[in-house]
Amino acid sequence: MKDLKRKIHYWCSDTMRNKITGKGVVCAVLDTGITQHPDLVGRIVGWKDCVQGKKTIYDDNGHGTHVAGILAGNGKSGRGLYSGMAPEAQIFAVKVLNQRGGGKIRDVINGIRYVLLKQKEMKIRIVNISIGTLPHKKDPEDELFLFWVERLWDAGLVVVTAAGNKG
């Protein structure tokens, strides 16, 4: 673990030393939503709520805001000690998960479809989808979800997904 931390530290130092900050990059985050946070001020450039249809940004779970911070937090609230991987990137937030962090695959698919609709207008280049499922029997919805993820790839977007929390 110590070696892993050291490698991550060196990688982060390399990106900052080479001024890889995410400036000019818009990342769509499909998650539980997003709230205004000091580390994200002025960089939330879009919003869509596929769960409840609210027009104002919110995160009733906190996970989406956390993910956005890992991605693009500028570290101001932590006096620069903790910043995201791309501290100048912009966030296009899409709420696809409910207050408990769960959701319906159709909401995720609707979120993906919305990102594809807005990709050119908002200049979205990266899509983060932090969802996971437990192993289960084959479900037709899984195939539909994969179809739409492949549409993201076909559109030239970089897609980042969660590896899971269960090992």
Question: For each predicted feature, which ranges?
Answer:
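Short, well-ordered amphipathic alpha-helical segments that serve as non-catalytic structural scaffolds
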Residues: I8-Y10, N74, G111-I112
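Autoinhibitory propeptides
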Residues: M1-M16
